[in-house]
Amino acid sequence: MYKQGEPNLWTGRLDSETDPKKFRHFQTVTFEDLSKLEKSSMPSGVGILGYAVDKGVALNKGRIGAKEGPDAIKQAFAGLPDLNQCETLVDYGNVYHDHEELIDTQKEFAMLAAKSIANHRQTFLLGGGHDIAYAQYLATRKVYPTQSIGVINIDAHFDTRAEQQSTSGTSFRQILEEDENTDYLVLGIAQGGNTQSLFDYAKEKKIDYVFADELLSHVSPTIKDMIERFVHEHDVIMFTICMDVIDSAFAPGVSAPAVLGLYPHTVLELAKRIIPSDKVSSVSIAEMNPTYDADNRTAKLVANLVHHFLK
């Protein structure tokens, strides 16, 4: 079920009503009905769409609450300064789960997300469970039907479980099994968060991955080169971040809190090798769970990641 954006979420400190250099995002955001959006001849600006769904988390035996994530992130983002002076910033609202099967909600989200991807230079998709990634892939493939897609996931988990239905832990297996013209790179894998069968599947499918342990102090030149080579080798990049990759000291409000997780600045450093590329079709950020957040710490962290990713 799709609902348009809620203006009441977008509030913040008012420094000026006339000087754009003092504006914050709540002063520049607009709202549109994404279901009625016509294709633009020239993509521009930024589109935001929420995936207010945690059904996949529940099916994956995780702790629920991430369906409230998109609104919490938008509220935190609203008060940040508009340093980029975006020519267009549109909150398209959220998609909610009201179907019998999760896959039907994913397909509904994908149809709408594809419109934003086709119409904007940047599209941010806010979760919600990490089953958003499969929906993001469907949207990407709709916009780019023949191009090679490189999927980059900053995550503690492979999320390549073999299940009978979509869950927050199956997205990337679904992608790899359905589409031979995709490859998968995972940054931040937790050795204690993935079974041997998942490592075996990664070997079988030639999934490139980097352990979290290799990223705790710095991002080495070897890893930077790996990312840049992966970006170079693909026509389109689908970029996604699962917030459970970040240590719970910084991100307590997630579906599965991390022990020995990454520092936020490490995630930013990794993203610097990805975001500047014009190949990035969209960015999704998943598993922000307000139910377990402290002082809105995790919502603010996601909001600041989006803020840093604006270009």
Curated annotation (Swiss-Prot):
Pathway terms, separated by semicolons: Amino-acid degradation; L-histidine degradation into L-glutamate; L-glutamate from N-formimidoyl-L-glutamate (hydrolase route): step 1/1
Domain of life, source organism: Bacteria
Enzyme Commission designation: 3.5.3.8
Keyword Isomerase assigned: no
Chain segments annotated as coiled-coil in the UniProt record: none
Record-listed Mn(2+) 1 binding positions: 130, 155, 159, 242
Cofactor stoichiometry and binding remark: Binds 2 manganese ions per subunit.
Amino-acid positions noted as binding Mn(2+) 2 in the UniProt annotation, renumbered to this chain: 155, 157, 242, 244
Record keywords: Histidine metabolism, Hydrolase, Manganese, Metal-binding
GO MF: agmatinase activity; formimidoylglutamase activity; manganese ion binding
Catalytic activity annotation: N-formimidoyl-L-glutamate + H2O = formamide + L-glutamate
GO terms for biological process, alphabetical: L-histidine catabolic process to glutamate and formamide; L-histidine catabolic process to glutamate and formate; putrescine biosynthetic process from arginine, via agmatine
Cofactor section: Mn(2+)
Pfam families associated with the record: Arginase
InterPro entries cross-referenced by the UniProt entry: HutG, Ureohydrolase, Ureohydrolase_dom_sf
Protein task: Catalyzes the conversion of N-formimidoyl-L-glutamate to L-glutamate and formamide.
Family: Belongs to the arginase family.
Protein name from the UniProt record: Formimidoylglutamase
Organism: Staphylococcus aureus (strain NCTC 8325 / PS 47)
Gene that this sequence comes from: hutG
